[in-house]
Structure formats: C-alpha cells, structure tokens
Regions:
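Short acidic/glycine- and proline-prone juxtamembrane loop motifs at membrane-interface regions
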Residues: 132-141
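Start-transfer (signal-anchor) and selected internal transmembrane alpha helices
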Residues: 1-27, 113, 206, 210-211
Length: 258
C-alpha cells in the first residue's frame, strides 16, 4: 500500500512537472557557466543594468531589436541583485517554464507519462542551453513557441483563455526580436484563417482582437511612462530593421555558379 502511494505520487503530472522544472533550471545553470560567447553572451547584461539605473532603450540609446529581454533582465537584477548568477537564472527560469509547457502539451495529446517525461527532458537539454545566457533570438523563438502551444490548445480544447493568451505571447515574441517571430505570426494567422473559415468559429476572433488591443494599449502606456516616443519605437523597431532586410534581399542573387 505504501509503495503504491509512493509510486502514484512520483508518477503524478504535478510532481513530474515540478521535477522537470527544477532539472531544466539546473541544467541551464550548469551549462551557462561552461563557457561564454563574448559578443552574444553579455548582450543583455549591460542593457538590463542601464535600465535599472534609469537609462531606457529607444529613448537614451539606439536599438534595432526588441527590448523585452532587456526589461525582463532589469527585473531580475532588481529582484536578485546584479550578478552573473541572476543573469543566468533569467535564462534558466525561462528554460524551466518552457519545459513544463512542453510536457503539458505532450500530455494534452495523451502521450504517456514516460515518453512525455523523456521528450520534455531532452527539450530542456537542447532549449536554452545552446546559449545559456538570455538572448533575444531564443526569447523570440520560445515566446513564439508558447504562442503556437496556445493555438494548439485553443483549437483542441476550445477554451477562450488560450485565444486571449495567443496575441500576448506573439506580442512578447515580436518585442524580443522581429525575426523569427514575424514569420511565425504570419504563418499562424494563415492557419487561423483556415480554421475560422472551415469551422465557422468566428467568436475566437473577438477574444484575439480584444487581447491584442489591450496588449497594445499597455505597451503604449508603458512607453509613455518611460518617456519613449511612438516615433522612436517605429523608427528603431520597425523601419530601420526593415531597411536592413530590404538591402540584404536586394543584394541577394540566386545562382547555380556557387
């Protein structure tokens, strides 16, 4: 009887998710200290520290990528102090949350606990450990992944909460980095259009639009509080990166000559 209770406890989804969460954090904490990319590894350390000291991106210094990662890092520095460990913990916590979300996606599709545990563990090893430290590409890709998870759950479970969360995660992905989030967002809207037309589920659009509007309003209010003008946001986040991309595309030549 006792062994059965122990077995039931350690095979419970809640216990397994907590186990994966802790393991994912420890894995990233370990590998983040094994080495560092000089350029990328500290990409958000200085911006996070500057925000903590009252210097804000877009207003006080120029950026060409999203700013969400910098603000999140500033929050970690505020809560845990300015140190290497608190810097890495940002990425580790994100790794843990993503791993748990992945586990529940597997379980949602009725994959047995053993395989869900193994696949989620492999995910935790490969997800944020390739960088170890907070990085805009990873945040953008993984916020996009959470958005895709919400789309899957919204269609499968037909719960309005997931439609509400969908634009929020995509908004955070875009504000982390414009690419790859833009490609994921456009692809998702294409899938969503097909779903709405075929299934006649027009109600979901209401929740998506309301959530999107609230998210945009919050961002505008936050920017106003920070003294960031809309013009600076559009120039640095939208227009200038777009001009870089257009120049690269214009110079691209498709040839079979190598």
């Amino acid at each position: 009887m006792f062994l059965k209770k122990v077995n039931d406890f350690i095979t419970n989804d809640k216990f397994l998710s907590i186990f994966l969460f802790i393991v994912a954090i420890l894995i990233n904490q370990h590998y983040a200290s094994r080495g560092i990319f000089p350029m990328d590894g500290f990409a958000h350390f200085d911006p996070g520290y500057r925000i903590l000291n009252g210097e804000y991106p877009l207003r006080d210094y120029w950026v060409i990528h999203g700013i969400i990662v910098d603000y999140i890092q500033a929050a970690f520095f505020f809560l845990f102090g300015v140190s290497w460990k608190s810097y890495v913990f940002h990425a580790s916590l994100f790794n843990g949350l993503l791993t748990v979300a992945t586990y529940f996606i597997f379980r949602n599709f009725k994959l047995n606990k053993r395989y869900s545990l193994i696949y989620s563990f492999f995910f935790s090893v490969l997800a944020y450990t390739s960088s170890g430290t907070p990085f805009l590409d990873h945040h953008s890709a993984f916020f996009s992944l959470l958005g895709i998870y919400c789309l899957i759950l919204a269609i499968d479970r037909e719960k309005n909460l997931y439609w509400i969360l969908l634009p929020i995660f995509f908004g955070l992905a875009f504000l982390s980095k414009q690419v790859p989030s833009s490609y994921v967002i456009l692809s998702t809207f294409f899938v969503l259009f097909i779903y709405v037309v075929i299934k006649k589920k027009f109600d979901c659009l209401k929740y998506i639009l309301i959530s999107s509007a609230i998210f945009i309003i919050i961002i505008l209010i936050f920017g106003n509080i920070q003294g960031i003008s809309l013009d600076s946001f559009l120039v640095q986040i939208i227009y200038f990166p777009q001009s870089i991309g257009s120049e690269r595309f214009a110079d691209y030549k498709l040839t079979f000559k190598g």
